[in-house]
């Protein structure tokens, strides 16, 4: 699998604190190894638009689509509680 980052994702990533960026980088490596890795807690977020959600940490999530052999990163944001 490969990774593609949308412009919207890059803007969100740039706004995230450095410790969140570092945690995200670790999580995306796990995603590349195994979509079902337990610490990602990846799940289908929006069935109609084929959007997935995965966990960065307790307070942050990232969103992506799977297009062929590519994970398209859409956003990384604080998790609304």
Predicted stretch roles:
Residues 29-54:
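A short, surface-exposed loop/turn module that caps and links secondary-structure elements
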Residues 25-30, 76:
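A short beta-strand-loop micro-motif that forms or neighbors metal/cofactor-
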Residues 22, 27, 43-44, 81:
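Context-gated lysine
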Residues 2-7, 11, 15-22, 53-81:
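Enriched for short, Lys/Arg-rich terminal
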